[in-house]
């Protein structure tokens, strides 16, 4: 991570000193778009997995997670997996939102 941050800082210094560079700007825009698409694909896969549990247990994931966190559902392996998938999807959605705010 440190190497990446160092490179970004170097680019920032370069742009501040020499002005806007179309190639760098386009490359960064494409990189951001690629990462957003990557997040979309991961969220889509996790949402598909969550739908399986929602069909089996006839319950929305957000309702399930609230009940699970309150300890009302026990430690069934399905529930542990469902909870993990739900948390992973929510984390990815938060990260995607952060990345979108840079556009």
Residue ranges and their predicted role:
Residues 21, 28, 35, 42, ...:
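Surface positions of alpha-helical coiled-coils, especially the charged/polar e/g heptad sites
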Residues 32-46, 50-53, 85, 89-92, ...:
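Amphipathic alpha-helical coiled-coil segments
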Residues 3-4:
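Extended, helix-rich structural scaffolds rather than catalytic motifs
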Residues 51-73:
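Short E/K-rich amphipathic alpha-helical oligomerization segments
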Residues 9-33:
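Short, charge-rich amphipathic alpha-helices with coiled-coil/heptad character
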